[in-house]
């Protein structure tokens, strides 16, 4: 029986693909070598220990229907679209070795006519007239008896959109998370005009088979045709949840301030695991009572725009004569934390 397994996802859903990756990684026999090929529609993927409010322009993502997905490996934030090919190599220990998977990807690129080389710990670069340009970034995860190496190859990604989502708003955040380094990147289509996801997948597959000296049939998976993966529904539910994607952010503080016609407002939030642990409100408003009441209501609240709005608008019952001010405050606050 072959020790290789090849899976190709037909889904562009990042939460589905990361849930498949997680399930296979947890359940594969330690003797198996797995290659999983996939791609995501418009998504910002962040590292396991990152703060989405610090790394991403979450408001712009929401406006443009770009998803957020937290992966289980470390490293920085990346933007995925259908111009990216994603790969995951998995193996049991002691055989797991990221230099093997890196060489498989380099061999695949070489077979396609691209000479690339490893750079630093995580990147593959090509030489251009403007200097070295990154075409691939990777991240890794290891447990006691197994490991995986996953990464992306830039084929024809809309690089102009990176700055839209990976540069956060000028929010006054003092965060304990990890800040991503923005690398200089290029697409493989600059070197291989017309290169497709299917061609790249085939090249990686052939290099994978060549390295191990055996072949297997590909398993095509999609939300309508999932492999037999115990606990997949629970893993997908977690992967797609707000609690995992946002709530796992490291503790951070957020300062918001705005001047309205009726006075200036400064809000200080301390946030842990996606919940406000401390809220302070400062104002020169002639009627500070609603804002003082708001500070109390926000303690323990989920740090989510709709929840903040809900708590603010709940004060209309107690302060009906401040309706205009509270509605202005509610709309501003929701926009500021998106």
UniProtKB/Swiss-Prot annotation:
GO biological process, one term: protein modification process
Pathway: Protein modification; protein lipoylation via exogenous pathway; protein N(6)-(lipoyl)lysine from lipoate: step 1/2; Protein modification; protein lipoylation via exogenous pathway; protein N(6)-(lipoyl)lysine from lipoate: step 2/2
Span of the signal peptide: none
PROSITE patterns: BPL_LPL_CATALYTIC
GO cellular component: cytosol
This protein's UniProt keywords: ATP-binding, Cytoplasm, Ligase, Nucleotide-binding
Enzyme Commission number(s): 6.3.1.20
InterPro entries: aa-tRNA-synth_II/BPL/LPL, BPL_LPL_catalytic, Lipoate_ligase_A, Lipoate_protein_ligase_C, LipoylTrfase_LipoateP_Ligase
Ranges for domain BPL/LPL catalytic: 29-216
Amino acids binding (R)-lipoate: 134
Subcellular location as annotated: Cytoplasm
Gene Ontology molecular function: ATP binding; lipoate-protein ligase activity; lipoyltransferase activity
Pfam families membership: Lip_prot_lig_C (PF10437), LplA-B_cat (PF21948)
Sites where the protein binds ATP: 71, 76-79, 134
Classification via PANTHER family: LIPOATE-PROTEIN LIGASE, LIPOYLTRANSFERASE 1, MITOCHONDRIAL
Subunit description: Monomer.
Note: In the transfer reaction, the free carboxyl group of lipoic acid is attached via an amide linkage to the epsilon-amino group of a specific lysine residue of lipoyl domains of lipoate-dependent enzymes.
Similarity-based family: Belongs to the LplA family.
NCBIfam families from the UniProt entry: lipoyltrans (TIGR00545)
Entry function: Catalyzes both the ATP-dependent activation of exogenously supplied lipoate to lipoyl-AMP and the transfer of the activated lipoyl onto the lipoyl domains of lipoate-dependent enzymes.
Protein name, per record: Lipoate-protein ligase A
Encoding gene, per UniProt annotation: lplA
